[in-house]
Design a protein with these regions (language model features):
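A short alpha->beta transition loop at the rim of the catalytic pocket in nucleotide-sugar-dependent
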Residues: 101, 126-128
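Acidic, glycine-centered active-site loop in nucleotide-sugar glycosyltransferases
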Residues: 79-80, 119, 140-155
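Donor nucleotide-sugar binding/catalytic pocket of nucleotide-sugar-dependent glycosyltransferases
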Residues: 1-27
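A charged, aromatic-enriched C-terminal amphipathic alpha-helix characteristic of glycosyltransferases
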Residues: 154-200
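Conserved catalytic-core segment of nucleotide-activated headgroup transferases in glycan assembly
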Residues: 19-26, 31-77, 83-98
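Short, polar loop motifs at secondary-structure junctions
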Residues: 1-3, 67-74, 135-138
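Glycine-centered short loops/turns at secondary-structure junctions
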Residues: 61, 128-129
Length: 201
């Protein structure tokens, strides 16, 4: 980033990755109502290339909840087993995620997306959801670094119905501990504070 933007003035700086809001770590106020098999959170336009995969979820007899605004171009292609919440206040997102048994992480396997931190995956982990994801570079790095085990889907469409069928239940998921990624802790670790002679609270 420094090289591409021409930041060569020697001003102290720090690179900060994405974190998770504290609200995602708060225990639920009541027992979750597990209405759905899978939940997807994020920018819905990015789901358009994955419509065939969403159809495989439907064909496997599974239900999916989309949390967020769904554009009409996508809504028109959704199978009947997909439900949409519409826009949800940020503080209510954890409650919506807990309505499902698995978090669905879908990211186009092209740069720069396949190198970027998936905020939704961090939030799935924070609320304790096992994760199903397409296979790409960052998700493999994160799973190895944080000792997680995610159900990574193959690129072969003919395998998807099985992956969302009996394999969905049988996979040995491990949800990694991401408490160190809560925003206050993440920000407190930035080296920039030393240059500014500030001690984070």
């Amino acid at each position: 980033v420094r090289e591409r933007m021409g930041f060569d003035d020697g001003v102290p700086s720090a690179l900060r990755d994405m974190g998770v809001a504290s609200v995602f770590f708060e225990p639920p106020t009541h027992a979750p109502d597990l209405t759905f098999d899978l939940v997807f959170l994020g920018e819905m336009n990015r789901l358009l290339p994955f419509v065939p995969l969403l159809q495989s979820i439907h064909n496997a007899g599974r239900t999916l909840l989309l949390v967020g605004d769904v554009p009409e171009v996508l809504r028109a292609q959704l199978p009947a087993s997909v439900s949409c919440t519409g826009r949800v206040p940020y503080t209510q997102v954890p409650q919506q995620l807990r309505r499902a048994r698995f978090g669905l992480n879908l990211v186009s396997n092209i740069e720069p997306y396949n190198q970027q931190t998936s905020t939704k995956l961090l939030e799935y982990c924070a609320v304790g959801l096992p994760v199903v994801s397409n296979d790409y570079a960052w998700v493999r790095y994160f799973a190895a670094h944080y000792q997680g085990n995610f159900h990574l889907l193959r690129d072969d469409p003919s395998s998807w119905q099985f992956s969302f069928g009996e394999a969905l239940e049988a996979y040995p998921y491990v949800v990694p501990d991401v408490r160190e990624l809560v925003w206050p802790k993440l920000l407190a670790k930035l080296a920039i504070w030393k240059h500014l002679h500030i001690v984070p609270e």
